[in-house]
Amino acid sequence: KEYRRQRQMCRRDRYIGKEAIYRRLRGEVPFTLAEAAVISRKMGISLDKMIGGSFSNNAVFDLNVVHHTNTFETYHDILTKYVNAFDNIREDPTTEMATSSNILPQALYLKHDVLSKFRLFKWMYQNENIKCKHFDELEIPHKIYNIQKDFVNMTQQMKTTDYIWDNTVFEHVVRDIQFFSEIHLVSEEDKELIKDDLLLLTDELEELAGKGKYETGNDVRIYISNIKFDATYSYVATSNSHISMIRIYSINAITTQDDGMFRSLKEWVQSLKKFSTQISESGEMQRIRFFNEQREIINTL
């Protein structure tokens, strides 16, 4: 019965002859990659895991790279994919997210329109294929601002979240803003608007650290590292699923659902707590000092 079902599926989906199907099912002729992909999708078989059985040291990554030919559409599609994925697990009581970050995490700043616009502008300016030479020239579609806020909202649905920050997370963005201001690509007026967003974000984060909870009631733990990070690593997990993320090219991240990569990345992120000070709920003096230092850095703009 199972053999007959497989034969019928192969014939229906691949439009190949009866004898050709028999030879494939008997193993006399290998399936092509295209045929294997169709069967994988129809039967819910993971080709990644099948391949991983033979190549145990390899992991398959999704690049999630924003294309310069259709920048806003691909960026919107990537954020939409994350929003939908997080929405699917939001009711799971085991959800957890963790990020070790050397830049301001997107999950915290994307709801601020001017600040998020600056991050997009920086990426576009670096990309020679995109003609965007001044901050004023960049017009962000309204749907981008909306999906960014949806993304922030969905990350706050995780039952527990750990943020481990490099102690220069604000310094990095302040230097970027100052650079673009000095080469006259960001006006003084726009610089002040970005500065206002940064100060507002600082106030929000200090309040968040004091409470140790989002407005959703979900737990947040914030740590400040005493060592520098070379990259930003994140993961989102439930009791039966997970995804690992590594930040690349400023606004992009490569992702994988590989089990081995997840275990390794989670272990690395959690190990950074040994070099860090928790400033959420406890550590009031360290918390006050850290955020006052960030305001001083921002006010140099």
Region spans (language model):
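Single conserved hydrophobic/aromatic residue that forms the stacking wall/gate
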Residues: K1-C10
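The alpha-helix within a helix-turn-helix
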Residues: R11-R12, S40
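A short, basic/aromatic helix-end/turn motif that makes direct DNA contacts
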Residues: R14-Y15, G44
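Recognition helix of helix-turn-helix/homeodomain-like DNA-binding domains
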Residues: Y15-T32, V38
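DNA major-groove recognition helix of helix-turn-helix/homeodomain DNA-binding modules
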Residues: A34-M50
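Helix-turn-helix/homeodomain-like alpha-helical modules used for DNA recognition
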Residues: F55-K133
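Hydrophobic protein-protein interaction segments
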Residues: K122-F291
